[in-house]
Amino acid sequence: MEIFTHLLLLSVLYMECLVGFTVNMIFLAAIFMKWKTQRSLPTCDKILSQLAISRGLYFFSVIMGNLIFHFFPWLLQNYIVLSIQYIQAMFMILISHWIAAILCVYYCVRIVTYNCALWVFLRSRISTLVPWLVAASVIVSLLSSLPLGWFGYDCKSQNISNYSAGSITGNGFVIVPNMDIWFLILILGSFPPFVIFCAANSLLIYFLLVHTKRMRNVTSQNLTSHFGALKSMSLFLVLQIMFYIFTSLSASGKFLRIKFVIPIYWIILCFFPLFHSFYLFFSSSDLRKILISKCLSFINCT
């Protein structure tokens, strides 16, 4: 019964990751088709493409990590493979936080209007700053993840071999993750982008709420667009907060000895980016129209 439950949870996790990877690759393909048609992309779509890439790689890394852990555990006896696995797992989480923060800052700067000189300067420069911000986020995420390659695990005797997150080496030791280091690196690496994201998103939601109240007597089309933006950013804020909470809980290692906790944690952690990826794709009518038209033209040609 335990084996059946474990396999069922793994099947749900792999299916969830495959769907998430596919949705983000379709989203990325739609953006590419838009660029191919128009020969240019607005900055917002460029950031969304980076978000789709980071989430696609996140789902792919979850699949590969769980495949290695459950079906090829002997690979984790190699310290190089283990270090690479730990580094890329942390990198995917941190870069997702940073890209989400950059997207929210861009929306906030472009939509919120203030007469402050710094704000006016940011509005005029934000499009040119975005590529540098993305590059900096990649570097910061990588540098923040590298310590896991050296300090992210401990070697202990086989008397704790029942530890669900460990792997036994050929020397009779069990390699277990050092959850104190995991938690410390995750908090130090993800807290700055999370604070930036929450601050920018909260400011944007407040501005949209105030602006929507002032537009009660304006045309319904403008009011509908503001309601849509308000709903989208509120959903993004809730999902990102939940993602941050559950990644922090998983990195704390408090529940690793509970049966089936690892696949359950990954199922929960993958749900938030999966749900938001679906929402982004189906709420973007332009990208859906471009993708549908390209698919129809391809079908007609064949």
Say what each PLM segment does.
Residues 99, 235-241, 245-249, 261-302:
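Seventh transmembrane helix
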Residues 144-150, 169-200:
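Extracellular-loop-to-transmembrane junctions of the mid-late helices
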Residues 46, 50-56, 210-244:
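Intracellular effector-coupling site of seven-transmembrane GPCRs
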